[in-house]
């Protein structure tokens, strides 16, 4: 504390507060003061004032409560949920019945009069700020109360007393014991802040790192209509946005990924009549269908919020958890709170456990995955707080949503499952802190699951978390994230699922040797590209399906390009600035047929593996427009988002004529190799997977900047084996290490090296056979692209050879 105010001051304006005042006004209020006084003018933070810890202690001392509370808590067993509830209610009753000391009440009235001015109907938020809250090693996660839409000094005084009492909520008492804080060293400051009219706009939470992987190069923003409490509490499934910090800094289009939330309800101010009748300050109402089907923020809003987030993170020098609101009257964005992120940022640099299911089962429910672990146990459905004591250690806690009152029992669960909520909701925050998996926003988990059923809760498969029937076997491995020894070639990764890219990129790697579009098309789009292009001239059922998936986008075609671009950009941003080689779509006709509408457009083929795929498809009149959408997505990611680390790979190029035509089409769509006058270092590579590619390697290289060996297809076509056959009689003959296959690979490597062009491999072979990887290194291959789970072992084995 400095001479900005006196140690005995009871009330302090936010403008006079700094982060050094945490012991005086708690982390929340100190942070507000710091931002108002120290951040650039462009970052808007609503002003207000705070009562001090000294004021709180004087308040308790005034009524002799200090000693009474201490004695009441001295013998309390916080594991006894009912005893905890009785003690908490008793203490809160004492505090709310206690009058303010005259000097404290006068100070509050004076500060409020100055803040409100002539606007007698102005709305304020009355928030708690515990003096141990928001320290980097502990998240108090909203344990004390917040009151919104408080109007007039009498209501402010009343709510302040409730805020003081909330220091002794059941969850707060339990949490202090769990974290080792003595009750009497934690005091409470009440902050009174001018309200942003986000009830007429939108609000949410953002983190300056990815909440699941800890990846630090993105800002993660959640948003929903109305007051932000619905997002914080987990009452809605919000919209989600990822912003790439390097692109933001470079002035490029930085929003790399969006997920449309259901946003079923919103919280708004109660009317004066409702307040008079029920005393409620806010109410929840259903969101209109039209509003649900569009994003609650524009890309421009998201970009501005991300700029604020980066400024705040740089000021504090650590990852931050930030609440924001968009005022529906003036259209401006405001920062409402900022606190240190308390989970992932403290795990940086540590060896991590990676969980993997060894089996599969019936999916009973699914939602947003929180964390990357797997939990098993019996289902325990809890409908309300009165049933909390039914949760036993190791249970799977299943409920509609959680709030801070649930925390005493959440730590008993082996996993948490909720109907509602997004990645920044209360259940998600506490699950991360406790280190247990959670699946939130399932919609109907309390209906789909039954008490006592043994289930597996898996958060190890990307953004989506699954609840499987039965206890599935799980494999747990330690993942190294440190420096690896130097070897004479590059170890890259095969990545199909963009949702795992932020995690994979933190493992040792030299980039991505194969980024597949098939996962993005299958999981993020799900519709055949020709059904998208033929819309609206398609049958009614297909039309409804297309309209359903394309919600929130300008058109079905825009949806297809947007989702492709977002998936590609997520992988490219994760590994930036290392190279990411994106293979154009390589579905076979039987795989395209499985997409919505696919059966209407795909031919019947006896052996799709040898049929209408790869370059043959792109250059055909039937698929030309669909190919154009892929090119548009790639161009957007490279040019507009500035992710020029993307390189393009063309699969299954059978003939030199196809090579000429497909590279010409790419150029026509604005994707020109740098060696042919293109910009930003674009390289176009071909898959070497047809024997003709190796036999005529020198001629094919006239059209491409290198080759990547697809050992799966090259093996089947060299040996005449159908890898989709399924016949055990043939399985033992399928081996990339066969001398004929090796001869093809050697020829391709030699041709590329002779011309100084890239040569890598991205097939399954090196992942399955370590000796094959060693042979490739001896042959002079430039890079080996592996499945992520084999990267470290292969790297270390190659390094050990010297």
List PLM regions with ranges:
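N-terminal beta-alpha lobe that positions the nucleotide/phosphoryl donor
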Residues: 1-191, 200, 289-300, 305-308, ...
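Acidic, glycine-rich flexible loop/linker segments
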Residues: 66, 329, 340-345, 364-369, ...
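Long, charged amphipathic helices and adjacent flexible linkers at domain junctions
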Residues: 73-76, 84-87, 108, 180-181, ...
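Conserved alpha/beta-domain cores
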Residues: 112, 119-125, 130-140, 144-148, ...
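Extended active-site and interfacial segments that coordinate phosphate-rich ligands
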Residues: 140-174, 198-274, 336-368, 412-419, ...
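Conserved metal-phosphate-binding beta-hairpin within the catalytic cores
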Residues: 142, 317-342
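Conserved catalytic alpha/beta cores of large enzymes that bind or transform nucleotide phosphates
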Residues: 218-321, 326-329, 368-375, 399, ...
